[in-house]
């Protein structure tokens, strides 16, 4: 049996900091972020199914969300303003991400690859499931902005404005429900939510 470094690489997710160009009151790594995205994606899928006639698999979507940023253990977290500075950079970075995803998949023993492929290779996921994960990813970035702004960190004001646009572009009924029901609490203190 051949040794695999796959999970040793995933364990390094905790070392990759998000928001690297921003002064943050509370730091966040991609391991923490992926767990929060999994929570939110799962909730969005449940909300869509219960309230808006969806037929999604919330557990599968939570797994997709857990793995959605794993390629960053090889690429690092490129800040959004750089990643999307122009279409050429965005296109080339997508190629880098795809190569990193394939490299991670290739680290697994051959007999496990088919089971992990849908979670590691982003272009193999079902478009409806991917859309929920993308929505959750944007919501989590938005919630981070709310937390930082409510703690007095105005460094996140511009990021929040950019995310307001992103959330409008990705709008869905389940997102609106989630944001109306859960987001306001992120601007409150511990005493206020207790």
Swiss-Prot record:
Site (Appears to be important in orienting the phosphate for catalysis) location in chain: 18
Molecular function as annotated in GO: 5'-deoxynucleotidase activity; metal ion binding; nucleotide binding
Binding site for a divalent metal cation: 33, 68-69, 137
Cofactor: a divalent metal cation
Pfam families reported for this sequence: YfbR-like
A GO CC term attached to the entry: cytoplasm
Function recorded in the entry: Catalyzes the strictly specific dephosphorylation of 2'-deoxyribonucleoside 5'-monophosphates.
PANTHER family: 5'-DEOXYNUCLEOTIDASE HDDC2
Family per record: Belongs to the 5DNU family.
Protein name: 5'-deoxynucleotidase VC_1978
Organism encoding this protein: Vibrio cholerae serotype O1 (strain ATCC 39315 / El Tor Inaba N16961)
């Amino acid at each position: 049996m051949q040794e695999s470094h796959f999970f040793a690489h995933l364990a390094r997710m905790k070392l990759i900091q998000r928001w690297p160009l921003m002064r943050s009151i509370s730091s966040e790594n991609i391991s923490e972020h992926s767990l929060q995205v999994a929570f939110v994606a799962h909730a969005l899928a449940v909300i869509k199914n219960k309230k808006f006639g969806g037929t999604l698999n919330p557990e599968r979507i939570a797994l997709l969300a857990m793995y959605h940023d794993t390629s960053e253990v090889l690429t690092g977290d490129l800040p959004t303003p750089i990643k999307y500075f122009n279409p050429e950079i965005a296109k080339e970075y997508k190629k880098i991400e795809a190569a990193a995803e394939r490299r991670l998949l290739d680290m697994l023993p051959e007999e496990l690859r088919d089971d992990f492929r849908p979670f590691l290779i982003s272009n193999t996921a079902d478009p409806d499931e991917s859309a929920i994960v993308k929505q959750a990813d944007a919501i989590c970035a938005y919630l981070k902005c709310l937390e930082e702004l409510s703690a007095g960190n105005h460094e996140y004001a511009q990021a929040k404005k950019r995310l307001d646009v992103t959330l409008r572009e990705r709008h869905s009924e389940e997102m609106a429900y989630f944001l109306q029901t859960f987001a306001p609490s992120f601007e409150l203190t511990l005493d206020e939510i207790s």
